[in-house]
Every structure is written in C-alpha cells, then in structure tokens.
Swiss-Prot record:
The keyword RNA-binding applies. One of its GO terms (cellular component) is cytosolic small ribosomal subunit. The gene is rpsO. Part of the 30S ribosomal subunit. Forms a bridge to the 50S subunit in the 70S ribosome, contacting the 23S rRNA. It comes from the Bacteria. The keyword Transport does not apply. This is Small ribosomal subunit protein uS15. GO terms for molecular function: rRNA binding; structural constituent of ribosome. GO terms for biological process: translation.
Amino acid sequence: MSLNATEKAAIVAEYAQSEGDTGSPEVQVALLTTQINHLQGHFKAHIHDHHSRRGLLRMVAQRRKLLDYLKGKNVDRYGALIGKLGLRR
C-alpha cells in the first residue's frame, strides 16, 4: 500500500520548502500521513493483520518524532503543517 510516483511527487511539490526539497520534516510528515491514511482503510477490511499494524505503528512513531523535532526548531512551521494536514495537535 505504498504511494505511486505521481502521488509522491505531488505531495513533495506541495510541501517542499524549495526546489528539489525532499528531506525537510514537512515533506516527510506529509508523506507519512498519506501512507498512514491509506493503511487505515486497509485495516478496516483486514482487522487481524497484525504484521502490517506493526508497520503502521512504526510510521506513526516516526511521524511523531519528526513533528516533535519541527516543533522544537520552528513552532510557526509546526503549527502551519499540522493545520494543513488536519492533525489533532
């Protein structure tokens, strides 16, 4: 349930800070959020898929770490990102 190249390129273009930016926390969090949202649909149909659930939990933890890093570095960018992605915090 990974993203195809066009979806990934669209997300990178939307959240990149500059041309060719693929490693900024905003881009990484946006990609992880999209993958997490795709997997939520998978788990509605496959409730007992515990192996994939472990991968989902790793993605959620990685996203949390990146958000904490961004919050420590620049609170304004953090607030803008969670508002744009519709995350709870």
